Amino acid sequence: MSKSEQLFEKAQKVIPGGVNSPVRAFKGVGGTPVFIQKAEGAYITDSDGKKYIDYVGSWGPMVLGHNHPAIIDAVLKAVPNGLSFGAPTESEITLAELVTKLVPSIELVRMVSSGTEATMSAIRLARGYTGRDKIIKFEGCYHGHSDSLLVKAGSGALTLGQPSGPGVPADFAKHTLTCTYNDLDSVKTAFEQYPNEIACLIVEPVAGNMNCIPPKNDFLKGLRALCDQYGAVFIIDEVMTGFRVALGGAQAYYDVKPDLTTLGKIIGGGMPVGAFGGKKEIMEYIAPTGPVYQAGTLSGNPIAMAAGLACLTELSKAGNEEKLAAQTKTLAEGFKALADKHNVPFTAQYVGGMFGLFFTEQAEITNFQEVMKCDAAKFNRFFHLMLEQGVYLAPSAFEAGFMSLAHSDEDIQATLVAADKAFAQL
């Protein structure tokens, strides 16, 4: 029995399912989850001492690679001054200034401790600001585990929200309308049906929780126009895409300006940080300047602020954005070429520093329905073949992969050598 197997057995006695976030349990791919002991650069090392080239990167935050010296140094300098104050600090101002500089649509920003907090708070703010209750989200898009956003999509162009499982009251979930990603007509239908009731529309600008699905054509600009037409707040959820698709986020890459933006992952440099921000007139509706309440004991935590500031400062250096995108392109197109070589039905999609692997006959995957038709069983086999060769991909056919600046050309080539062998066995 491996050390990971021993630890998983032990964990299940004191932690529900043995993990503190469901995807870590490997239920999507089968087998025992790998327990990590340490990480450095592009590599993670498990409890048995085996090293893996890591394309999960803690689900996105580790864009500089693990244990980056600039972040570690910033944290070590901040720690002696105290771990938490529950009071304002200069570091939260400095990070906020950098965020508003990098993302011009954000005029004011509020720090929180997670992406879920960010999206939950942004939706509450939009509801308070507009005086409306209903929200629009998209099938297959994930915005954290708050009640408003944990709803089952159902079929058809438009579905009144149904609870995705126990714990979400139907009377609450009914205010969530679910539309089809990359389908403006489904959104138009929602607005036409409830023209004066929709507080906001929230969207992942690149859907990263049904693998990696970029927006088609002018999908995002079409959403912007519909929100303007019907007086709804347009929220772009950049928890995953922020600073990764481009320094200014996916909104800069696709040239679209939201009313509110949610951030997470990279903004904390590996520490628990989230944020939401946007137009001054909307953000001033949040307490203490406005009537919509939001608070957090650890919001703006000084250690987390130091890590986030170091991460964004390093990431902002000339050439890093281009390097990240180029490395991602090399990897994704390399996967596709090898699949073609071995006659495996497959497509790879990528943008900026994120990518998705789909086992499908389709040349392009554009929404959740198409994702569900992909061969998840084949992905699971591919995942384990890669894992055996020391490559750690996302343990789910529905999650995006992440490149980091620490991945070298040699790391990518080693990954593709492993992929060549894996595709040959499918």
UniProtKB/Swiss-Prot annotation:
Q: Which reaction does it catalyse?
A: (S)-4-amino-5-oxopentanoate = 5-aminolevulinate
Query: Which UniProt keyword terms apply here?
Result: Cytoplasm, Isomerase, Porphyrin biosynthesis, Pyridoxal phosphate
**Residue numbers carrying N6-(pyridoxal phosphate)lysine:** K265
List the Pfam families: Aminotran_3
Which compartments is it annotated to reside in? Cytoplasm
Report the SUPFAM superfamilies cross-referenced here: PLP-dependent transferases
Instruction: Spell out the InterPro entries in the cross-references.
Output: 4pyrrol_synth_GluAld_NH2Trfase, Aminotrans_3, Aminotrans_3_PPA_site, PyrdxlP-dep_Trfase, PyrdxlP-dep_Trfase_major, PyrdxlP-dep_Trfase_small
Query: In Gene Ontology terms, what is a biological process of this protein?
Result: protoporphyrinogen IX biosynthetic process
Q: What is this protein called?
A: Glutamate-1-semialdehyde 2,1-aminomutase
